[in-house]
Amino acid sequence: MASAQSSGSSGGPAVPTVQRGIVKMVLSGCAIIVRGQPRGGPPPERQINLSNIRAGNLARRAAATQPDGKDTPDEPWAFPAREFLRKKLIGKEVCFTIENKTPQGREYGMIYLGKDTNGENIAESLVAEGLASRREGMRANNPEQNRLSECEEQAKASKKGMWSEGNGSHTIRDLKYTIENPRHFVDSHHQKPVNAIIEHVRDGSVVRALLLPDHYLVTVMLSGIKCPTFRRETDGSETPEPFAAEAKFFTESRLLQRDVQIILESCHNQNILGTILHPNGNITELLLKEGFARCVDWSIAVYTRGAEKLRAAERFAKERRLRIWRDYVPPTANLDQKDKQFVAKVMQVLNADAIVVKLNSGDYKTIHLSSIRPPRLEGDNIQDKNKKLRPLYDIPYMFEAREFLRKKLIGKKVSVTVDYIRPASPATETVPAFSERTCATVTIGGINIAEALVSKGLATVIRYRQDDDQRSSHYDELLAAEARAIKNGKGLHSKKEVPIHRVADISGDTQKAKQFLPFLQRAGRSEAVVEYVFSGSRLKLYLPKETCLITFLLAGIECPRGARNLPGLVQEGEPFSEEATLFTKELVLQREVEVEVESMDKAGNFIGWLHMDGANLSVLLVEHALSKVHFTAERSAYYKPLLSAEEAAKQRKEKVWAHYEEQPVEEVMPVLEEKERSASYKPVFVTEITDDLHFYVQDVETGTQLEKLMENMRSDISSHPPVEGAYAPRRGEFCIAKFVDGEWYRARVEKVESPAKVHVFYIDYGNREILPSTRLGALPPAFSTRVLPAQATEYAFAFIQVPQDEDARTDAVDSVVRDIQNTQCLLNVEHLSASCPHVTLQFADSKGDVGLGLVKEGLVMVEVRKEKQFQKVITEYLNAQESAKSARLNLWRYGDFRADDADEFGYSR
């Protein structure tokens, strides 16, 4: 500034020195601040007061240190005078002369618009407009004072300004220093531009603005950015942060006392967040581009002009290391372009923030959605540590989030843009270990999945340190989406009660499974979602209608077994077990399917058929040579397609049929019998299978009698319920027992361990249970076994020998449970024994021999009997056994194990 190099003396020379500067600010109608040109930093400034004139004082707010002080209003015509100078001088070059300098340092002089004194005399212009007056008592003893006197007389004659009629009260502003409800004030403007004057610049990104026409004086913080500030010390002084003064000057030189428009976007405490619009540009973006500011996440979401513009401007300054970014080190890129952007197929959704995709190479990759956090338990919602947590159902909104992603993405191709790789982290006392994570932006049809999830309130946005660049490339859109979700009370941000999902997991719970079985059988095809694939033929399903989880086994096929971890060893999987599992996963995992439940096994697993898009999964596995047809398929409606699929796979000699060789058909010579075997089959209903392969049946012919008795008995009990705890059970006594389904059945007490443990046998169904005595009662005489005998009769299979090995026996029992439990069969008594009659059992529809089917599958061995009437059937059983041995099925997988010393293992030839 020229005045910094040559200034007038305090006494004032005869010919004052002409100095130049740029008007920074107009303090009032008779005082301005001028500055010089910047050279390596903010330039020096000085205040110039106009000589010989007086303008009204502007309003002043009472000092905060004087609570009883009152605000001083504008004097009449003070604000018009200030505005006259502001519009004429701000940012313009002026020249001035100093005529007088007080002992306190105040400088008085003349100011001219332009580079020399030939320009407009500002004092004369003010007086001529009636916005200022000559100082009282001043004598017109020089040309300048004479001209002021003439200007004042002309203004009076023309009744301009303060000389007009009236007291000038209409020129006094009603200044409003505070706003009672800033949020309501901001919302009332609906983000429409408001005319304003910037009255003060606190730092590069915080200003004081006068909003027009209502004269609200408000502090405005620029949305989305923050400049270096001036730190206030304990002694009251201010210490600027690096580049704070430069940033302040940058904003001052462009906005101070300029006419602008402000978009009021939000509020923070009593301060308003906004964007200042000027005809020459957007100061927010300019500050970023010049390296005077950085983006801030907490307010960038409310920026209405496009947050991506701010990020781009910041990136521009970072790349060039401008000012506050002079020490910036960009993150190292360690990914090839092909690894950074790719298209992949979504195979699985993991909770609510990660997916598993299949790459074009066939490899699988887990992708985490960048910068979002799935729903989680917090505060009072944290459950008892002793209770097993099921995140999908127990964490509020986790199920909704997972379902949103599942329905949108499963089986679809998505675009993946990797944003960052989160390195592996070790476990601490409070945080578990994390493996390396690939975090990316995933889009489908141009929609950012993470943004959609956040906008529905089904996820939240992670907050980072300001200098952390490891974040989503669309981070600002995520913040904006979260702000919308919070404002609209969506999902996690809702004030309503959180949704509760009471999902019963009946996997492996035999008693619960038995209760559900009749409902699922009657339902026919039920809708389901495949939650997990254990193996090619074993799945976990969620049934939405029944709100339960079940383990489901595919019927009609024999799929290769996968590897199993047993105590002390790892059992290797059968060939092609992994391929079968992968095939099923790719086809049905997390897809919506339809299932037909036919039966259940001993472990409470349901058995049936699974359909997806009209295709039967059992048939598809056989068709792709990943399974073989099980003999139980013979009585199903899908036997023909299964058989044709298997035949085609055999001919191709693929996978499980790679070493298939057609076996020559052995002719079995008929054995002449002296005595014919008696075959008189009667219909029965199989109700229970025991662990030693015995079973209980009900006579179909007396079934209606049992139904009528049960109906009458339950009606009687409902009218006269037993008193809880009044019945004292004794071994061998008949009673009534309350089963898990809440109904009463006839039973017999087998053992009393304690009042809390009473062993009972249900005489009409053949199953056993341990109950407390409080769930037992005396059997009413009207429903005793004299009225209707016990309906469950125990039988054993004839002509077969049950394996002594526990695993092998379990396989045989499971097979029988799948095939005949809760189904109608045909029974023929072959011979008697000390324990129970031995019988052959046939399927009611196909007339296939159940026991013979077990032999064919290599699940049991033949019991050779010498009676002549059984020779024909024994021969058939032995031939089936030889076929199973040749095919190395189940018991015979390692050849004929029945060596000379096999007796010690419980086997006999």
Curated annotation (Swiss-Prot):
Q: Where is this cross-link: Glycyl lysine isopeptide (Lys-Gly) (interchain with G-Cter in SUMO2)?
A: K512
Q: Where is this motif: Nuclear localization signal?
A: 320-324, 387-391
| Compartment(s) of residence | Cytoplasm; Nucleus; Melanosome
Which residues does UniProt assign to the signal peptide?
none
Domain of life the protein comes from: Eukaryota
| Any GO molecular function | RNA binding
Which residues are reported to carry the modification Phosphoserine? Answer: S425, S644, S784, S908
Q: Where is the Tudor domain?
A: 728-786
- Its main subcellular localisation, reduced to a broad class, is cytoplasm
User: How is the polypeptide modified once translated?
Assistant: Phosphorylated by PIM1 in vitro.
Write out the transmembrane intervals.
Answer: none
Q: Which reaction does it catalyse?
A: Endonucleolytic cleavage to nucleoside 3'-phosphates and 3'-phosphooligonucleotide end-products
Q: GO CC terms for this protein?
A: cytoplasm; cytosol; dense body; melanosome; nucleus; RNAi effector complex
Is Phosphoprotein one of the keywords UniProt gives this record? Answer: yes
Occurrences of domain TNase-like (ranges): 17-165, 192-327, 340-495, 524-659
Where on the chain is Phosphothreonine found, per UniProt?
T102, T234, T239
- Enzyme Commission number(s) from the entry: 3.1.31.1
What PANTHER family does the record point to? EBNA2 BINDING PROTEIN P100, STAPHYLOCOCCAL NUCLEASE DOMAIN-CONTAINING PROTEIN 1
- Identify this protein by name: Staphylococcal nuclease domain-containing protein 1
- Name its species: Rattus norvegicus (Rat)
Give the taxonomic lineage as stored in the record.
Eukaryota, Metazoa, Chordata, Craniata, Vertebrata
Q: Which gene encodes it?
A: Snd1
